[in-house]
């Protein structure tokens, strides 16, 4: 049996989300149909507002509704360290652990020749300009995921940054190979920041 077109379109829309297959998308579509109209309208408005009101910080690349973001504006944070992550969600995960009090920089991905993603596709140039302009930075902590692409990106960044005399370290203990920062618990992230190693 074929679903009516509005349901098919809704299922297709849900399937565009990462990790959502046909079965889950169908379940979400029927759940949405069963919701009352006010809740569906509020949900739709939240989606539109997130897309319209959020953008990337012009300094660090984190997601924000103000520019610069709250972290970059916070002068009480340690201005001597910048922790480099793959995605904005990684900033949220690490900051939630409340053990790191420095600045962040979001790459928006990692080097991946297989996917055709090179240095020019990442937020690397702005990091280098930021380091050149901000002489207070003494350490860059690279917190890319423990994947081959994350490791390659960390090594690439270290080669670019070290000649400037800035210490470059990498998150350590507790993050197993192939793991994503997003899914690590707060204690593991705290230990990873504390136990970082120099590259």
Curated annotation (Swiss-Prot):
Residues 80-176 form the Toprim domain. Gene3D superfamilies: 3.30.60.80, 3.40.1360.10, 6.10.250.240, RecR Domain 1. GO terms for molecular function: DNA binding; zinc ion binding. A zinc finger (C4-type) spans 57-72. SMART domains: TOPRIM. InterPro entries: DNA_Rcmb_RecR, Rcmb_RecR, Rcmb_RecR_Znf, TOPRIM_dom, TOPRIM_RecR. One of its GO terms (biological process) is DNA repair. Keywords: DNA damage, DNA recombination, DNA repair, Metal-binding, Zinc, Zinc-finger. It holds the Pfam family RecR_ZnF. Belongs to the RecR family. May play a role in DNA repair. It seems to be involved in an RecBC-independent recombinational process of DNA repair. It may act with RecF and RecO. NCBIfam families: recR (TIGR00615). This is Recombination protein RecR. The lineage of its organism: Bacteria, Bacillati, Bacillota, Bacilli, Lactobacillales.
